């Protein structure tokens, strides 16, 4: 009898070991699957972010990324590597055990926030669920059904859906105007106000009048000009008028010596306030409507309104 008990005990032990081994194999296979589906950043050629309100599609040709809806859009190339790294991290994240019937507990039963990542002809689509206590996020891969814990830093890619494609626009870098490189500045405003400043032997003049000291703050302001946002790329007919750019509050034509030692011009047209402390502007002959901080245009707007006293 003892012999039979020993044999049964051995069989039970073997069965338990087999079951444990099977579970380990399952976990190993899931981990291997995640590793196999990890997409390298350099191989990623397309990203598609979507939610209930919009879809953002990006594709890469050679080394250049494009917004698929309009390939002429000035997409900020410097912003794309961070997005690609975040997408790659998502594909490489480790799986966690979540039963199909428990998906709702992790916010994964009916989520509409997704990211599709394509590399070498293979696409993986991730749906965002709830945030874990660790700060990571539960993500479900549609292609293999795995649920993965993805770092909060990687999941920040979805913040793009809180704004618009204009947040991804490359903004023009304006020249730095200084007392040394300024050649002339013509400022025009309402009521036929027109101020022509020219530099003669290092002295700024309006007619024969020396206005070097009176225009010092203006020159400093011109040297700090920068656009802060893209408001409307390729605006429709009438958009400029809505922004007050058909009858601008100020327009400046500045000539200066560029880094190559040749003469260049900067034309800045300032429209109406945007309601959030900024001004609608256009730069040179580009019809794109940009935004500038109103505080960076105080001297220019004052000169355009009152002239040089």
Which residues does each predicted region cover?
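Soluble, acidic/polar mature domains that operate outside membranes
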Residues: 2-309
């Amino acid at each position: 009898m003892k012999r039979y008990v020993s044999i049964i005990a051995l069989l039970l032990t073997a069965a338990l070991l087999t079951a444990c081994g099977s579970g380990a194999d399952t976990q190993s296979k899931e981990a291997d699957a995640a590793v196999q589906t990890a997409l390298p950043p350099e191989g990623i050629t397309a990203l598609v972010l979507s939610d209930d309100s919009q879809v953002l599609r990006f594709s890469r040709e050679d080394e250049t990324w494009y917004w698929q809806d309009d390939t002429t859009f000035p997409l900020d190339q410097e912003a794309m590597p961070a997005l690609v790294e975040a997408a790659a991290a998502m594909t490489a994240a480790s799986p966690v055990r979540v039963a199909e019937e428990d998906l709702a507990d992790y916010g994964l039963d009916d989520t509409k926030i997704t990211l599709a990542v394509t590399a070498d002809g293979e696409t993986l689509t991730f749906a965002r669920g709830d945030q874990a206590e660790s700060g990571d996020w539960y993500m479900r891969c549609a292609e293999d059904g795995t649920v993965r814990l993805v770092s909060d830093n990687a999941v920040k890619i979805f913040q793009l859906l809180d704004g618009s494609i204009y947040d991804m626009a490359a903004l023009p870098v304006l020249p730095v105007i200084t007392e040394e490189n300024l050649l002339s500045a013509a400022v025009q405003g309402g009521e036929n106000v027109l101020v022509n400043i020219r530099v003669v032997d290092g002295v700024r003049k309006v007619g024969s009048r020396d206005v070097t000291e009176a225009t010092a703050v203006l020159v400093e302001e011109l040297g700090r000009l920068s656009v802060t946002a893209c408001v409307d790329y390729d605006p429709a007919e009438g958009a400029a008028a809505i922004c007050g750019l058909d009858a601008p509050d100020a327009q400046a034509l500045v000539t200066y010596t560029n880094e190559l030692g040749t003469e260049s011009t900067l034309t800045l047209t300032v429209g109406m306030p945007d309601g959030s402390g900024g001004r609608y502007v256009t730069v040179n002959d580009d019809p794109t409507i940009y935004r500038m901080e109103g505080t960076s245009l105080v001297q220019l707007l004052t000169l355009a309104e009152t002239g040089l006293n």
